[in-house]
């Protein structure tokens, strides 16, 4: 079973009198920075000139270029997109890191797959909230929290685990609980979930459902409602209480259909395909593909994005959502 840590497991002295540089002020960056600041820690922002820096300054932070922020820091938190981290790390972070300082990540991608190699004289750990930045911030302000994962990759000082837990406490996560893991486990499970289920799997399932109905002569609008719009209703029930609550809440007709038809659609062959997706993640095949495409200006990525945006379900959905102002209001 997973080991879970809470507030009373944290020594809150490890971040005391340390300056924390949060690099990036996007979804996770702003949430980590504000929560740490409200927890009483000394936080500066490292970000280039632009809207993000202006927003950070409006939120009460001193903001600097990345290199200057790192020079000032005892703890450097890398919260930039995966695809830019390697360049920024090599050019603007490494030359300015203090020995015996700490490097913090919210995702292990670049460290695990070797795109980033930390110096041998710094601690390296990750703290990964299991929710988007706005939720991390909102729950903290309410006195609640989003759970998180944490892992230590390099422990030079002997204090990396204690520091990671103190950091998790600073962003509020130990209120809910933080689970100990490894960079390998966090990275590979995160990528698998995105590719096989949460993003890749579900979007392809929806497309095939929409196409099956429209090719059989049903109106696209009804197809959209049945395979995409109502997905949220089902997912919300599972989110709140697992599949048991979902099945308790739907009709007997729907539940019976779940049992007799689900395995006809998602066959054992799908599980074998999932295993191959996982194998490509584990071997580094996916990471190499992603990094190579990024180095080529994301040519393939942009082409795939354009193709998917042109699927008929997007036009049908855009029109139908005009009938549902409550969606935008929420």
UniProtKB/Swiss-Prot annotation:
GO terms classed as biological process: isoleucine biosynthetic process; L-valine biosynthetic process
Pfam families: KARI_C, KARI_N
Chain positions recorded as NADP(+) binding sites: 25-28, 48, 52, 82-85, 133
Keyword RNA-binding in record: no
Domain KARI N-terminal Rossmann: 2-181
Entry EC number(s): 1.1.1.86
Amino acids binding Mg(2+) 2: 190, 226, 230
Residue positions of the active site: 107
Descriptive protein name: Ketol-acid reductoisomerase (NADP(+))
Organism for this UniProt entry: Macrococcus caseolyticus (strain JCSC5402)
């Amino acid at each position: 079973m997973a080991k879970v840590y809470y507030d009373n497991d944290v020594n809150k002295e490890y971040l005391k009198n340390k300056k924390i540089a949060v690099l990036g002020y996007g979804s996770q960056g702003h949430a980590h920075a504000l929560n740490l600041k409200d927890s009483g820690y000394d936080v500066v922002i490292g970000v280039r000139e632009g809207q993000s820096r202006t927003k950070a300054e409006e939120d009460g932070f001193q903001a600097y270029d990345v290199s200057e922020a790192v020079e000032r820091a005892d703890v450097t938190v890398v919260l930039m997109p995966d695809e830019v981290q390697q360049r920024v790390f090599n050019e603007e972070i490494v030359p300015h890191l203090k020995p015996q300082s700490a490097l913090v990540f919210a995702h292990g991608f670049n460290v695990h797959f070797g795109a980033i190699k930390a110096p041998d004289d710094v601690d390296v750990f990750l703290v990964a909230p299991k929710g988007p930045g706005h939720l991390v911030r909102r729950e903290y302000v309410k006195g609640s929290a989003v759970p998180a994962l944490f892992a230590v990759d390099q422990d030079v000082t002997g204090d990396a685990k204690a520091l990671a837990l103190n950091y998790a406490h600073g962003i509020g996560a130990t209120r809910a609980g933080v689970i100990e893991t490894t960079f390998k486990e966090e990275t590979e499970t995160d990528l698998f979930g995105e590719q096989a289920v949460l993003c890749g799997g579900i979007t392809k399932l929806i497309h095939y459902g929409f196409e099956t109905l429209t090719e059989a002569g049903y109106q696209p609008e009804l197809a959209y409602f049945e395979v995409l719009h109502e997905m949220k209703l089902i997912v919300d029930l599972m989110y709140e209480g697992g599949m048991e609550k979902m099945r308790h809440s739907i009709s007997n007709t729907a539940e019976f259909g779940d049992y007799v038809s689900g395995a006809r659609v998602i066959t054992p062959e799908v599980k074998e395909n999932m295993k191959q997706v996982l194998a490509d993640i584990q071997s580094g095949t996916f990471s190499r593909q992603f990094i190579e495409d990024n180095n080529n200006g994301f040519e393939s990525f942009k082409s795939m994005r354009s193709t998917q945006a042109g699927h008929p379900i997007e036009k049908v959905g855009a029109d139908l959502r005009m009938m549902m102002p409550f969606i935008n209001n929420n």
